[in-house]
């Protein structure tokens, strides 16, 4: 069946991008047809209409305005769609020159995917948007990642077990891989909410990949960037190939690849990141996370660096020391720190502005952002230059300079507040280009220019009544009376004034100068815009030529922001510099949980109860706190706060404590909290066992492990056995530093059997039948769990609480007396019978109790007391 030329063009383009929604530009709208329209209308909640017919059926259609398309794009990307953006490559007028029925040329200019976003409105300014690439060459594996909005480009070798933890660390938006690996990676991608995209195997061919990398960076060999495995080269090459596909050949500005190693940062698995709520709270948002509480950065790049440091605490002692030295310097120089932050507040997002310009998605406002950022950089250079700086800040200082020429050029070229888009014009400063100033003058002041010319012609001819007028037939012309016209028609005036028309009373002339002016006025607006666009392209080239140095400056500004932010945090919240070394120490005095402390401060003003922790261990030995105590007493908070303090220390931050000594930690593991995995048919207990198994199989002697309530999801003796064996394994095999919280009081016996285990408990106090949580950790074991009291605090009905006390008393009595088996005790409890009886009403006071209440022991002689005892015994057992 025949289709219209426009629909034929659409179908041809759609066939090339079958797996994406096609945004087909038609004037001021992007339109979608057929299945794309149905899917987009549902995803965007917009009207589904129809346009024409195909094979006898209506063609579904929907559309979105071009000016607001970014918001719709963001919605589609978040719902895991890929969008092919098809633009008009010529105007309708240009198309008609090829024939009255010619269709406007269109082509896809970009494939929008979750990992290739650059627009400011589509991205979180304080979070990286990573595109990751997994490759395998024989038995070797590698992971590469880039953020094309900032230019970051990294690669690392990988073992199969480390893919999940690395994806958890990076939190990428998209993962690309060979089509043959898609099925193997689908589950892990779904676990982390990552869009998975398969590419042809050729994209990961290491030989062609190496050439693509060399071509991108304009080098003959990769040797200057380091030594890479074939798998690493393949992973990087896959990224470049994918960017070439999605950006239609216009590759972004990427920095040379940085090779990372697995032991560069603390290994933290996904479960631990989730449990500790490092960058995201369990509720799913940023609020309530560690990042939200400690982030004092004031630039977008500084915010991204803060997030990256929390996600990737270092294992390199020199790196940690340099960061701590920088924070100490900023804290010690309070006035300087304040001055630096005042200037940093004026620093825009240089990285993303630069990236948008390189991809032709930027505009004059991005140029102004670079100008303003570099201007503040120069001021910061002067501010810091007079101080003796620690190494990290000295390196940053070196990267703040060397932009004077570009700053001068940008200052001279751009207006103070340019528009967003180059197509609007009005962004080149007056006085920069004489030709542009003339065009603008003609465009904006055409009448006054004509008036001045009229005065000049009147003076030249001596005809004061001479006028310059305009009509749609002649355009601009000089008009005078027939009497005065004779003078202008005769030499020498006739050489200047050219006769155009004679009417009954008037004679009209023109001049070469007036004709040229008319052309200039008519074309002035378009000409001014063309000149601005030409100057824009020249200025963009100048900026991109300095892109490497601008990127270095952006990194230095982010480092300054992070350093001063951490110093400000330390000062305002009373944090101290930790001692970090190669030892096996772990000694914290008056440690606090920063998130809980912040919540208390905001909600009630109550102080956080600080606690000590000493897990310092000898080489090749474990040190474990076995923590007991009631629910709600603060065990989980204590576990988490010590893990967070260790993490903060190794990211290069001060810590919430009065003193801290941390021997380097290689891994951080956490098994805290309960959750099930219904999608995979895993119970809470199964999830707990899987996470515990991962810890026992991977933790080394430099790991810090926190375990909470291992074994609680199964039968009591099963759970106790698992918890007991887990603790022994941590002590004897893993030899880790660990905090192990449990309700199994029987386990406290291990402190006397294993040299590296110490009992600790969270203290409580009973007052008039109620429990008071003191939240203090002291050495020793808890005497009971206070579960019934906690249940009462939670609001269980009084009858339930009363019955629970009775059951607990009977069970504890049976254990003490040892005269009944567990089965006998349970059989005696109506609670466990087939038809349980309701909880009994409180018993009436007995005769014995009544007589006891009347007795005054101090008034009895020994003989009277003995006689009374026999009487009471007889009354109790009639």
From Swiss-Prot:
One of its GO terms (biological process) is mismatch repair. Coiled coil: none annotated. Keywords: ATP-binding, DNA damage, DNA repair, DNA-binding, Nucleotide-binding. ATP binds at residues 629-636. It comes from the Bacteria. Signal peptide: none annotated. GO terms for molecular function: ATP binding; ATP-dependent DNA damage sensor activity; damaged DNA binding; mismatched DNA binding. GO terms for cellular component: cytosol. This protein is involved in the repair of mismatches in DNA. It is possible that it carries out the mismatch recognition step. This protein has a weak ATPase activity. Belongs to the DNA mismatch repair MutS family. HAMAP family: MutS. This is DNA mismatch repair protein MutS. The lineage of its organism: Bacteria, Pseudomonadati, Pseudomonadota, Alphaproteobacteria, Rhodobacterales. The gene is mutS.
């Amino acid at each position: 069946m025949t289709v219209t030329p426009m629909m034929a063009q659409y179908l041809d383009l759609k066939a090339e991008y079958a797996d994406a929604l096609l945004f087909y530009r038609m004037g001021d709208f992007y339109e979608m047809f057929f299945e794309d329209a149905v899917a987009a209308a549902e995803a965007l909640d917009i009207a589904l209409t129809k346009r024409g017919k195909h094979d006898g059926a209506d063609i579904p259609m929907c559309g979105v305005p071009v000016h607001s398309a970014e918001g719709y794009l963001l919605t589609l990307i978040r719902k895991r769609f890929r969008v092919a953006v098809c633009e008009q490559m010529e105007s309708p007028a240009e198309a008609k020159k090829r024939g009255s029925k010619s269709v406007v040329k269109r082509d896809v200019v970009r494939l929008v995917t979750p990992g290739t976003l650059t627009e400011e409105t589509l991205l979180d300014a304080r979070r990286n948007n990573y595109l990751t690439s997994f490759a395998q060459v024989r038995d070797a594996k590698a992971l590469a990642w880039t953020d094309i909005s900032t230019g970051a480009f990294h690669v690392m070798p990988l073992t199969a077990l480390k893919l999940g933890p690395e994806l958890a660390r990076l939190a990428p938006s998209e993962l690309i891989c060979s089509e043959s690996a898609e099925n193997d990676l689908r589950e892990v991608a779904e676990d982390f909410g990552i869009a998975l995209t398969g590419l042809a195997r050729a994209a990961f061919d290491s030989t062609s990949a190496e050439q693509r990398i060399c071509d991108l960076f304009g080098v003959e060999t990769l040797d200057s960037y380091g030594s890479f495995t074939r798998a690493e080269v393949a992973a990087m090459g896959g990224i470049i190939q994918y960017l070439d596909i999605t950006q239609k050949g216009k590759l972004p500005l990427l920095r040379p690849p940085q090779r990372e190693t697995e032991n560069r940062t603390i290994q933290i698995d996904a479960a631990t990141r989730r449990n500790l709520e490092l960058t995201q709270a369990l509720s799913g948002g940023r609020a309530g996370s560690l990042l939200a509480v400690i982030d004092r950065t004031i630039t977008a790049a500084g915010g991204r660096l803060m997030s990256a440091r929390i996600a990737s605490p270092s294992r390199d002692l020199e790196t940690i020391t340099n960061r701590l030295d920088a924070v100490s310097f900023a804290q010690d120089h309070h006035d300087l720190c304040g001055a630096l932050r005042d200037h940093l507040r004026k620093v825009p997002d240089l990285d993303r502005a630069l990236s948008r310009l390189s991809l032709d998605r930027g505009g004059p406002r991005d140029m102004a952002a670079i100008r303003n950022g570099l201007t503040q950089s120069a001021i910061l250079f002067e501010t810091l230059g007079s101080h003796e700086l620690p190494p990290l800040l000295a390196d940053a200082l070196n990267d703040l300079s060397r932009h004077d020429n570009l700053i001068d050029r940008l200052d001279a070229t751009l207006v103070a507040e340019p528009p967003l888009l180059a197509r609007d014009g009005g962004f080149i400063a007056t006085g920069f280009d004489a030709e542009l100033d003339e065009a603008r003058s003609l465009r904006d002041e055409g009448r006054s220019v004509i008036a001045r010319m009229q005065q000049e012609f009147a003076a030249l001819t001596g005809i004061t009544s001479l006028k310059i007028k305009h009509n749609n037939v002649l355009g601009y012309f000089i008009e005078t009376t027939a009497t005065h016209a004779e003078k202008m028609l005769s030499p020498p005036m006739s050489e200047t004034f050219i006769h155009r028309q004679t009417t009954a009373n008037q004679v009209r002339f023109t001049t070469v100068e007036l004709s040229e002016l008319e052309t200039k006025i008519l074309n002035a607006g378009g000409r001014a815009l063309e000149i601005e666009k030409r100057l824009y392209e020249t200025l963009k080239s100048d900026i991109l030529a300095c892109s490497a140095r601008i990127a270095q400056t952006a990194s230095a500004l982010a480092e300054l922001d992070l350093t001063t932010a951490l110093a400000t945090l330390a000062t305002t919240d009373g944090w101290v510099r930790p001692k970090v070394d190669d030892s096996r120490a772990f000694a914290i005095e008056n440690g606090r949980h920063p998130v809980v402390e912040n919540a208390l401060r905001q909600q009630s003003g109550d102080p956080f109860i600080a606690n000590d922790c000493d897990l310092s261990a000898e080489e090749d030995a474990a040190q474990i706190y076995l923590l007991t105590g009631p629910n709600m007493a603060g065990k989980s908070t204590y576990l988490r706060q010590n893990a967070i303090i260790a993490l903060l220390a190794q990211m290069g931050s001060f810590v919430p404590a009065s003193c801290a000594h941390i021997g380097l930690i290689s891994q951080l593991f956490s098994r805290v909290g309960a959750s099930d995995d219904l999608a995979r048919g895993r119970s809470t207990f199964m999830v707990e066992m899987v996470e515990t198994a991962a810890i026992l199989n991977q933790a080394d002697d430099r790991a810090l492990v926190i375990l909470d309530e291992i074994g609680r999801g199964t039968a009591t003796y099963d759970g106790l056995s698992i918890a007991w064996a887990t603790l022994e394994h941590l002590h004897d095999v893993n030899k880790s530093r660990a905090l192990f919280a449990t309700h199994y009081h029987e386990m406290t016996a291990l402190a006397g059997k294993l040299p590296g285990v110490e009992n600790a408990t969270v203290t409580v106090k009973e007052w008039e039948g109620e429990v008071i949580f003191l939240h203090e950790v002291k050495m020793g074991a808890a005497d009971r769990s206070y579960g019934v009291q906690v249940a009462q605090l939670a609001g269980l009905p009084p009858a339930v609480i009363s019955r629970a006390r009775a059951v607990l008393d009977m069970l504890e009595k049976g254990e003490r007396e040892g005269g009944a088996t567990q089965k006998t005790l349970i059989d005696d409890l109506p609670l466990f019978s087939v038809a349980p009886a309701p909880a009994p009403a409180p018993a009436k006071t007995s005769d014995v109790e009544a007589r006891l209440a009347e007795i005054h022991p101090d008034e009895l002689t020994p003989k009277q007391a003995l006689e009374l005892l026999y009487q009471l015994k007889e009354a109790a057992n009639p």
